[in-house]
Regions:
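A generic "structured core" feature
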Residues: 165-171
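ATP/adenylate-binding site constellation spanning eukaryotic-like Ser/Thr protein kinases
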Residues: 62, 169, 187
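Terminal amphipathic alpha-helical/low-complexity segments used for targeting or macromolecular assembly
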Residues: 1-35, 40-41, 107-109, 113-114, ...
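An amphipathic, basic-hydrophobic alpha-helix
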Residues: 25-34, 46, 67, 85
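Short alpha-helical
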Residues: 77, 160, 171
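Flexible, glycine/small-residue-enriched loop-and-beta-strand segment within the central core
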Residues: 48-59, 65-156, 185, 193
Length: 193
């Protein structure tokens, strides 16, 4: 399977990734990692980072990942989705352990500077540094036909219902019912569509 890349595409080096590279660059991107599945109609723009780490990445038909976007870990994306510049989508777990994964349905629009991370740091023990207390993993689910506006943060464990709109700058800490418009910090339902 090969995917055409825009002129100017660059990949991190082994040193900047801190481990094995999952792809090799030539005229086309040749995916070598058995845990990365990108449909041939998907477009991966220059300077996007796609890295399954220990997980599995699946990107469906006609998806667009723009420059500066990061998709890593356990992430599944349906068809006809877009991830705009500088958005970060980080799933946790492995191909067999889905706790902490990010599941994105079809026809989802993710604007610039959106953050979805399937884990959060534990910081209950004051006698231990936070960085030694591990993370709590919870999956994030974005159902079909959702629009996530710019600079939104969706916390781990949240499900965004079908047809919902998340207003710019929102911090989503709770599940969003289908066909809802939410906004604010923390996000609250503004109206139904």
């Amino acid at each position: 399977m090969s995917i055409f890349l825009n002129k100017g595409f660059s990949m991190p080096t082994r040193e900047t990734l801190g481990g094995k590279l999952s792809c090799f660059i030539g005229r086309h991107l040749a995916l070598r990692n058995k845990n990365t599945f990108i449909d041939k109609s998907a477009l991966i723009s220059p300077k996007a980072l796609i890295n399954p780490r220990c997980g599995e990445i699946k990107i469906g038909k006609k998806c667009l990942i723009c420059h500066g976007a990061i998709v890593q870990g356990n992430v599944t994306m349906g068809e006809n989705c877009s991830v705009q510049p500088y958005s970060i989508i980080v799933g946790y777990g492995s191909p067999t352990d889905k706790l902490g994964e990010i599941r994105i349905g079809s026809n989802v629009r993710i604007a610039s500077h959106v953050m979805l991370v399937g884990a959060n740091h534990i910081f209950k023990d004051r006698d231990k540094p936070i960085c030694t207390q591990s993370v709590e993993r919870k999956s994030i689910v974005i159902e079909d036909d959702v629009w996530i506006a710019g600079r939104v943060n969706i916390m781990c464990g949240v499900t965004i219902g079908k047809g919902s709109v998340i207003a710019a700058g929102a911090v989503v800490t709770k599940d969003v019912p289908p066909y809802s418009v939410v906004g604010g910090v923390p996000a609250k339902i503004i109206k139904e569509r």
